[in-house]
Amino acid sequence: KYIQEFKNNLTEIGKPSVTKSKVKPYTKVSFKPDYARLGISGLSEDMLSLFKKRVYDVSAITDKTIKVKLNGQVVPCKNFEQYIDLYVGSKTDTKRVYEQTDPRWEYAVCLAPNDEFQQVSFVNGIYTSKGGKHVEYIMNQIIRKLCVYIKQKKKVDVKPTTIKEQLMLFLRCDIENPSFNSQTKDELGTAVPKFGSSCTVSDGFIEKIAKMGVM
């Protein structure tokens, strides 16, 4: 059992304590904000909500055998599909198409609620709020194949932007040595050839999206 404490912006680093554990392996992270240093009197509801979201993020994108707890309660979100439900409701509430062609790539698409493209994506467990090359990689395949599919079925040429603005993408992927466009790591900058793996969106996935209401 390894325990170590850090204080005052890592200026004070306590000595590690290593003892034999009597329980199953686990990781516990706890912290006490220095309100005076931060210039606040306490944590706002928005801050608490953000912390809660990050805990749910961890639960959704880590191994399914790992139990994640928040304030002593197991988080009821064990996989990426259940995580998607938190955004758009159940599959009955909102139709979506899900696919995992490789352990490194997992994604789902539903119709955008406001006719404006939206994305929720993760790279190696990091939430990329601005998307990036991984989102472009998957979306470009989806849009290109949908244009071809609609052309074949309806004999109509559709602009890529018309399709994109109808969709909402959820994406989780693992990238080798990812690079980001800023220190906030909210946008992936790694070029596609350096991903370390590839992903091909299946034709069946495209057909299901078309039948979902895009076409």
Task: Name the predicted role of every residue range.
Residues 20-31, 61-65, 108-118, 193-215:
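Short, compositionally biased low-complexity segments
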